[in-house]
Design a protein with these regions (language model features):
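Basic, flexible Lys/Arg- and Gly-enriched helix-loop patches that mediate nucleic-acid binding at interfaces
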Residues: 1-246
Length: 246
């Protein structure tokens, strides 16, 4: 007899609840149930037979996959679950007609481009460390940013005992009391740019993501969203298909 069971986190991602890694967090937090019983990491389900709920709501298959970009304002979190009741980016796309989740993360104090979708496999491939997706940030720091400090960050900074990957960093604008920098990274460690700047004595006062894998935020107003166009989708699916081929 054929076994139709798949891993629970894969089922959740295919149903548009979250990416696989975020789905694992929900399972570990005890927010997922299978047929009324709290699920554990490693559990498998038969999508046609088992009833799966997340926070009491029944999970159903995604009928149409949606992909859009959002200009995230400061003060919004991008976590799959927030016990503190803080404002969530999902609230900003509630009028999209379907439940969406963010691809990757952007700190609460940061702003700019976030991709939102209900396609868990797409999100998982795009955020996987092996994808090395380029992301561009416009970062304003207090005071002067010397070439020595920029070089140090370009070559890599030791964070939690692991050196950051080489990145591109240059001055976009100099003002009397602040410097505007551009960073291009292809990894996404927690609060990475802020911590890199802090390590060389720079204080970040504004951080905005402007581009992901060639998909640009452009003039999209803060707090607003729009569907990704055909060219943008082609750029992103090229990356996810390459990941599939590896």
């Amino acid at each position: 007899m054929k076994d139709n069971k798949i891993r629970l986190q894969k089922h959740l991602s295919e149903c548009g609840v979250a990416s696989r890694r975020k789905a694992e967090e929900l399972i570990e937090q005890g927010k997922v149930k299978i047929n009324g019983h709290v699920a554990v990491l490693g559990a498998k389900v038969d999508p046609k037979r088992d009833k799966v709920t997340v926070r009491g709501k029944t999970v159903t298959a995604v009928s149409e996959k949606v992909y859009l970009m959002l200009n995230k304002p400061r003060g919004f979190v991008t976590t799959a679950s927030d016990e503190l009741g803080r404002k969530n980016v999902c609230d900003l796309v509630a009028d999209a007609g379907v439940r969406l989740f963010p691809v990757g993360r952007l700190d609460r104090d940061s702003e700019g481009l976030i991709i939102m979708t209900n396609d868990g496999e797409f999100a998982n491939k795009l955020t996987h460390p092996s994808s090395h997706v380029n992301k561009t940030y416009r970062v304003t720091v207090k005071g002067e940013a010397s070439e020595e400090k920029l070089l140090e960050m370009k070559e890599g900074i030791l964070l939690d005992g692991i050196k950051t990957l080489p990145c591109d960093s240059f001055v976009a604008e100099r003002k009397p009391d602040r410097t505007v920098l551009i960073f291009v990274l292809n990894e996404g460690r927690n609060r990475q740019i802020r911590r890199m700047c802090e390590a060389v004595g720079l204080n970040v006062i504004r951080l905005k993501r402007t581009e992901i894998a060639g998909v640009k935020l452009g003039m999209l107003p803060q707090g607003k969203w729009r569907p990704l166009n055909e060219r943008e989708m082609r750029r992103l699916t090229n990356i996810t298909q390459k990941k599939e081929d590896v």
